[in-house]
């Protein structure tokens, strides 16, 4: 009986410690990448969902992307994959023939420890395809007439 009691108390204490450590992980995570692009038609390429297959590696058949708003300098989208919805926005600033494109995803997490600990790998999971996509976008825009 003592071993069962010790095991039960150990599981409770371990769970509380894991929960308290998870409180140190933020509940809002932003994954962001940016690139400088020479060209004036960056806004139109990003705002055109039909051109995304030419440059965006994250845009595929399993992800549903909804365009929420397209304004000068800002394209707001909502990405849905299975049951997860994530805002993914493009901010575009033009200056002296160069456009700075910032692409970011905002993850809002619940208090669950497994969600918070899982968010630690988001940058490694989303960052490289975002960088490759932005480089593809740069090649597409700079090589277009």
Roles of regions detected by a PLM:
Residues 80-139, 143-145:
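Beta-strand/loop substructures that line and gate deep hydrophobic ligand-binding cavities in soluble
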Residues 39, 49-95, 102:
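Extracytoplasmic/periplasmic/luminal assembly and interaction segments
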Residues 2-61:
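Hydrophobic ligand-binding cavity/cleft-lining segments
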């Amino acid at each position: 009986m003592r071993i069962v009691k010790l095991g039960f108390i150990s599981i409770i204490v371990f769970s509380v410690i894991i929960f308290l450590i998870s409180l140190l992980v933020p509940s809002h995570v932003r994954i962001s990448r940016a690139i400088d692009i020479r060209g004036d038609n960056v806004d139109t390429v990003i705002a055109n969902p039909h051109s995304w297959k030419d440059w965006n590696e994250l845009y595929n058949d399993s992800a549903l992307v909804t365009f929420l708003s397209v304004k000068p300098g800002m394209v707001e989208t909502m990405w849905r994959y299975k049951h997860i919805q994530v805002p993914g926005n493009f901010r575009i600033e033009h200056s002296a023939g160069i456009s700075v494109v910032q692409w970011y995803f905002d993850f809002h997490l619940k208090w669950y420890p497994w969600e918070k600990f899982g968010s630690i790998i988001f940058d490694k999971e989303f960052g490289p395809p975002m960088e490759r996509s932005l480089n593809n976008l740069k090649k597409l825009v700079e090589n277009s007439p």
